[in-house]
Amino acid sequence: MPEGPEIRRAADNLEAAIKGKPLTDVWFAFPQLKSYQSRLIGQHVTHVETRGKALLTHFSNDLTLYSHNQLYGVWRVVDTGEEPQTTRVLRVKLQTADKTILLYSASDIEMLTPEQLTTHPFLQRVGPDVLDPNLTPEVVKERLLSPRFRNRQFAGLLLDQAFLAGLGNYLRVEILWQVGLTGNHKAKDLNAAQLDALAHALLDTPRLSYATRGQVDENKYHGALFRFKVFHRDGEPCERCGGIIEKTTLSSRPFYWCPGCQH
């Protein structure tokens, strides 16, 4: 499943295609959304927001399309008039004069008013988004030490969207390697330096992934390109200590780590 950085890049692509352009055609597959089709024609997308793995497409008439891709949903951008060859089932079409965005295969799709945005069950449940530029390490540290989270093992906590939205398995693995901790550690057992390092890594790692993953221009990014240090690298030597990276299962997900420097 895509994690926060991939969802945010998808949102960027949707914005680049249709933001600010009048909608010339709107289509929804689900009957409960059909009545919104005519209400959105002539309106425009003001921005596309991410809340963890959910996408909020905001329209100029104050309605918001909520969508969660789950395992199979995917957004595509096409030239208007183009019909992609795919076996996926179309759920949403938002068309402008030159570009159209299409949502396939997703099942969790709703239209929300401003009031419903504040009471939506999923949006109420998720924690702060790691890609929110206003989220600081200090706030993350407060959450780590809160009664709700301080006794949780990191193996499960870093996958819990109620703690921080946008984290997933590859980020869990890479963050814990960065700070030399294991999935069995808990916030309540860390010293001040470890807590500080973890709070920063919980933001720095996903933000670096979002900003540079897939980029190759090391001059532009000063060598700080995101790449996997342990994820999918079991059997290889750890670049930090030379130990052999191992693979196990934690919280029902594959977990990669180096026993030589994560303890």
From Swiss-Prot:
What's a single GO BP term from this record?
A: base-excision repair
Q: Which UniProt keywords apply?
A: DNA damage, DNA repair, DNA-binding, Glycosidase, Hydrolase, Lyase, Metal-binding, Multifunctional enzyme, Zinc, Zinc-finger
Cofactor(s), by name: Zn(2+)
Where are the zinc-finger regions (FPG-type) in this chain?
Answer: 229-263
Q: Where does DNA bind?
A: Q70, R125, N169
Q: Cofactor note, please?
A: Binds 1 zinc ion per subunit.
UniProt cross-references to CDD domains, sorted A to Z: EcNei-like_N
State the Gene Ontology terms under molecular function. Answer: class I DNA-(apurinic or apyrimidinic site) endonuclease activity; damaged DNA binding; oxidized pyrimidine nucleobase lesion DNA N-glycosylase activity; zinc ion binding
Question: What name does UniProt use for this protein?
Answer: Endonuclease 8
Per the UniProt record, the source organism is Escherichia coli O1:K1 / APEC
Organism classification: Bacteria, Pseudomonadati, Pseudomonadota, Gammaproteobacteria, Enterobacterales
